[in-house]
Amino acid sequence: FPTRRSSDLMLTIKGTRGDRMVLGIPNNNVRKQYYDYLKEMFEEKSPIDTSKLDDCFYDMAYEGKWQEGLTFLAESYAKVSSVRDGIEGERNIQGFFMAYLNLCNYYITAPELELNHGFCDFFLLPNLAHYAVKHSYIIELKVLPKKDFSALCEDRKTTKAEAQWNEAVAQIHRYAEAPRVKALRQDTLLHKIVMQFEGWKLKNIEEVE
């Protein structure tokens, strides 16, 4: 298939998601190389305070305080995107989040993990072999172009943003109910987080009960 960037050459086809291909990184060495490449690319545009990020990761892992860290990542993404010709899209956001979540030693970050016949964007699996982590996370990212965010759906009753949010809530509930989740999260408390973007700006972030 055609590639848009040189980094695409480092990906391989892992499966399908409807009529789309699910791309994955073939092995751990290539994975590290790929996400190091992404991180360097983003750092050239707008460096991130990784010391602050480390503190946020600690709070997520041990205190269950996730909002500051994920909001910080979203705001950092907005700074990068605002100087990158207005590039928008879920794939771009996923790449950014993966590059920086991959810095967190408290978790094994699993992107596009199949759960209940769907694929969650990120599952932060507790790295209990090395850290006494108390909390784990499923994170679902949703993106709408600016022109569509406030537009009405065909029923003329709800906006496209509202419909997308409701879909994300239903999806993340379904992922969390997958039989394998209990084994994956082990004895940690699972948090289900939905993040919704209007273009490159975070508009909504919430823990789904």
Stretches with model-predicted labels:
Residues Y34-L70:
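Long, non-coiled-coil amphipathic alpha-helical linker/lever segments
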Residues T12-K45:
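Accessory beta->alpha helical hairpin/"wing" motif in late/C-terminal subdomains of nucleic-acid enzymes
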